[in-house]
Amino acid sequence: MVHLTGEEKSAVTTLWGKVNVDEVGGEALGRLLVVYPWTQRFFESFGDLSSPDAVMNNPKVKAHGKKVLGAFSDGLTHLDNLKGTFAQLSELHCDKLHVDPENFRLLGNVLVCVLAHHFGKEFTPTVQAAYQKVVAGVANALAHKYH
């Protein structure tokens, strides 16, 4: 559960309504794989990840980034039940994929940076603080199965 004020909820939903999920999803996942290269081990089937350019232009990275942000979008409509919303994904990432739950926090922080880059002055400190709460809540929900 994420506790947001009315102003914070409004800031999150207003900005999210302007997000191009295809573009931002691919960029966020790509940046995660470039900045934290050890995360690439979970994506060996994606083909060429040999350079930042290869990662950022990889169609499988872009497609999976879109899928990730689709799930994030779903979470935004269930802020009061993030653990329930992400229960199946938590189980998948824990039991089958064996993803280090710290990676969820890293991806959330990368997403905040990508949103700041895309929205510039519109990504105010208030908006950033609200998104930091949301990505922390999502990361916690995704890590829930690990506890």
UniProtKB/Swiss-Prot annotation:
Q: Where is the Globin domain?
A: 3-147
Provide the positions where the record notes the PTM Phosphothreonine: T13
Q: Which SUPFAM superfamilies match?
A: Globin-like
Keyword Transport (UniProt)? yes
N-acetylvaline: residues bearing it: V2
Q: Which residues carry this modification: N6-acetyllysine?
A: K60, K83, K145
- State the family it belongs to: Belongs to the globin family.
Q: What is this protein called?
A: Hemoglobin subunit beta
Which species?
Answer: Callimico goeldii
Whichever gene encodes this chain, its name is HBB
